[in-house]
Amino acid sequence: SLDFDFLEYEPEQSTKEGALKIQMSNTQLTSMCKHFASIPQPRKLIFIADADDTSTNKELGSESGFKVWGNNVYSFTIPVPAHRTDTPKICIEHYYSDNDIKTQVEINGVQRRIYMGNEFDSVGISVDGQLCCVDRNSCGPDKIRIIDGTSDKRVFCIQGDRKTNLALPKMEFADRVLGNSPEYSNIDFSSFSLIFDIINKICDQ
């Protein structure tokens, strides 16, 4: 069986008290790999990145499945599950099915959920013409980017209160999945075995 710990942290802008807060961009993740690999590490450190950025895929990934930096430091980008082979530039939320990602939850009387770029046209208007996404760069029929309600990725109802954000933050989604929220009671985690397979291979090194 695998024996490892995950570093749990929140984004810097998180309001959760007592949590470790880190701004973990792709660039910073790569820098951390280089830094930790420069000195011997007493235990294996594994850095895992989304697969939605070409330069990061090259820096942190490898055709063998993971990159060996030396001094017990390893990295890999998340492998692409079978249901995402047509759109391989993915982040961790894409491990879930589209239906699971789009599950609605009620927060303070507002129905919120994660949206995907292909639900909107290239100017940010939803297919049914009811909603608007302010992040046009994430929108379009060929895009599956996660639209999660952060300040620059708000979704609002065109005919309603434009101040009400309908998109669900990634961390709220993750907390509810982890907390066995009833809305996500039947969520499918099977794709995550791909990640644990790579961790297992690294642990066996």
Question: Can you name each region flagged by the protein language model?
Answer:
Residues 27, 90, 99, 190-193:
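Generic alpha-helical secondary structure signal
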Residues 10, 78-80, 140, 168, ...:
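Intrinsic-disorder/low-complexity coil detector
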Residues 1-63:
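Conserved helicase/translocase motor-coupling segment
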Residues 143-205:
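Nucleic-acid enzyme cleavage-core boundary/entry regions
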Residues 42-164:
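Activity-critical C-terminal alpha-helical subdomain
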Residues 38-40, 85, 89, 185-188, ...:
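Active-site-proximal structural scaffolding
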Residues 39, 99-103, 184, 202-205:
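Short secondary-structure junctions and interdomain/linker hinges
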